[in-house]
Amino acid sequence: MSDLLKDIQTYLIAAGIGTADGTDLFRDKIPDSPDAVIVLSEYEGSPLSFGCGAADRSVQCIVRALTHTAAKSTSWGVFNALVDPLEPIKNFTASRWGIVHARHTPVKFQEDRQHRILFVFNLGVTTPGD
């Protein structure tokens, strides 16, 4: 089995967003550098649904950039790559599908000590367990 966050990273790279894990895409940590990053983290979801073998998992995306415009633009680019109410089923990889829905749209989260801007949004992803 693969990891949901890695599979979402693979999907984003294929969509032209980000280049590689540990370069500008990260999981579960916000590194000090580079300045521009996309960070995916999983937090508490809901248990497996009876009869379908899938769980409603929760994923947070944090985008950091040097400017408000860049952070907002990148955040919305990631959001739009993952969220489409008319086509909610995403094939992240050949072996991983997910039904993606937004818990909220991208919003400014904070400005860090280096004056970099962070935007955040949260998703629900119904997908088989890892």
What are these regions (language model features)?
Residues 68-74, 90-95:
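Short C-terminal domain-edge/linker segments immediately following a structured domain
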Residues 69-70, 76-84, 105:
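Surface-exposed, low-hydrophobicity beta-strand/loop segments enriched in small/polar/acidic residues
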Residues 1-51, 85-95:
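Small/polar-rich, solvent-exposed N-terminal microdomains that initiate assembly or binding
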Residues 31, 52, 110-114:
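Sterically constrained small-residue positions within well-ordered secondary structures
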Residues 18, 83-130:
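Acidic-leaning, charged glycine-interspersed low-complexity segments
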Residues 53-71, 78, 115-127:
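Oligomerization/assembly interface segments of phage tail-like spikes and tubes
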